[in-house]
């Protein structure tokens, strides 16, 4: 039987169509995926992301442990700030991408549900020699409230320091109030926050948000929103065989004086060359989909890793992995026919506007 979040019955009550996602029963949509997508771009939407795995890392060795475990460096941020990073294997491949929240005396990680067992096993394996406690927090729910009006609406529903945090937090900063953690982060390319809170509090906040005009958003629109924002989906755009250099995650790699797992293979690959992730926009009709073949004018080939129809742009878009230096026009094989696509630098959309640049 699949896992269910504390909001499972609320999803059904809102008309949610439930599907299996990484072993969880989650809503794919509540009626119209397109309308949900536009609601987040134009107003505000709430996502139940309680299927994500929350892990607290404490102990005197937590800092040194995470500096070895992660490709990005937790020393780059102060308490109250968050950091996006990859957790790599010995070959530099991405075991998972995650967010680290740095507190005064410990850290919180949010990792993907589909990689939970692999992640926890890897983290435990490499904890030897460090004074650390790795503690999963299944009693916490997680809601993402996203969109241009999201923070204003949410602040009006909360009191005191929680409302202040929603109004004043800078991007990738967070604040804690009791058992709540409020972070100005997201996966949509819009402004908003993500809140970790006790399962017992989640339903009340969910109902308040819907009553205030915030739309419930399913996994379908979550995917089109993140793809417009040029954000990776683990298992599609990267996995253990793909390095950060090949997944447009090079900016998350800190090659400073510390040793971290996968560092040497990354140095070798950076010196020897590697494929690159780019954006594609289809010039004609049709839909770009994962695993479609991309053909470059010089005869080299690549592959689409994620593709969809962009409701905001009214065009089909994709992320693709191509040989280094790809620019201009390429051909994509769609149903055994070649169609022309333009190579662009993602993201495609931010804050409701087209922002991509042709390459």
UniProtKB/Swiss-Prot annotation:
Disulphides: none
The UniProt record lists the keyword Transferase: yes
GO BP annotations, alphabetical order: glycine decarboxylation via glycine cleavage system
Recorded GO CC terms: cytosol; glycine cleavage complex
InterPro entries: GCS_T (IPR006223), GCS_T_bac (IPR022903), GCST_C (IPR013977), GCV_T_N (IPR006222), GcvT/YgfZ/DmdA (IPR028896), GcvT/YgfZ_C (IPR029043), TrmE/GcvT_dom1 (IPR027266)
Domain of life, per lineage: Bacteria
GO MF term set: aminomethyltransferase activity; transaminase activity
One Pfam entry name: GCV_T
Keywords: Aminotransferase, Transferase
Major enzyme class: transferase
Reactions catalysed according to its record: N(6)-[(R)-S(8)-aminomethyldihydrolipoyl]-L-lysyl-[protein] + (6S)-5,6,7,8-tetrahydrofolate = N(6)-[(R)-dihydrolipoyl]-L-lysyl-[protein] + (6R)-5,10-methylene-5,6,7,8-tetrahydrofolate + NH4(+)
Entry similarity comment: Belongs to the GcvT family.
Subunit structure: The glycine cleavage system is composed of four proteins: P, T, L and H.
Protein name per Swiss-Prot or TrEMBL: Aminomethyltransferase
Gene (UniProt): gcvT
């Amino acid at each position: 039987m699949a896992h269910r979040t504390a909001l499972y019955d609320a999803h059904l009550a809102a008309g949610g169509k439930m599907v299996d996602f990484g072993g969880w029963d989650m809503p794919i949509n509540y009626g119209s995926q397109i309308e949900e997508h536009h609601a987040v771009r134009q107003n505000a939407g709430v996502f139940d992301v309680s299927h994500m795995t929350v892990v607290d890392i404490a102990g005197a060795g937590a800092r040194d442990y995470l500096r070895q475990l992660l490709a990005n460096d937790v020393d780059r941020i102060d308490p109250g700030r968050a950091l996006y990073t990859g957790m790599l294997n010995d070959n530099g491949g991405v075991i998972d991408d995650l967010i680290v929240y740095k507190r005064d005396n410990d850290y919180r990680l949010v990792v993907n549900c589909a990689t939970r067992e692999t992640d926890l096993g890897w983290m435990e394996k490499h904890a030897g020699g460090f004074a650390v406690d790795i503690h999963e927090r299944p009693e916490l729910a997680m809601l993402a409230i996203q969109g241009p009006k999201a923070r204003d609406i949410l602040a009006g529903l909360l009191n005191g320091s929680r409302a202040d945090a929603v109004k004043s937090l800078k991007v990738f900063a967070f604040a804690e109030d009791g058992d709540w953690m409020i972070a100005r982060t997201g996966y949509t390319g819009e402004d908003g926050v993500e809140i970790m809170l006790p399962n017992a509090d989640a339903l009340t906040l969910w109902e308040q948000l819907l009553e205030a005009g915030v739309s419930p958003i399913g996994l379908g629109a979550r995917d089109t929103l993140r793809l417009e924002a040029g954000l990776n989906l683990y298992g599609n755009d990267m996995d253990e065989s793909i390095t950060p250099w090949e997944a447009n995650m090079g900016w998350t790699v800190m090659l400073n004086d510390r040793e971290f797992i996968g560092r040497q293979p990354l140095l070798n690959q950076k010196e020897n060359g590697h494929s690159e992730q780019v954006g594609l926009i289809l010039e004609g009709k049709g839909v770009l989909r994962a695993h479609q073949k991309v053909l470059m004018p010089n005869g080299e080939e690549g592959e689409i890793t994620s593709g969809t129809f962009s409701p905001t742009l009214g065009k089909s878009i994709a992320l693709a992995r191509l040989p280094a230096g790809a620019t201009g026009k390429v051909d994509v094989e769609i149903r055994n026919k070649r169609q022309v696509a333009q190579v662009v630098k993602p993201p495609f959309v931010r804050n409701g506007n087209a922002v991509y640049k042709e390459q």
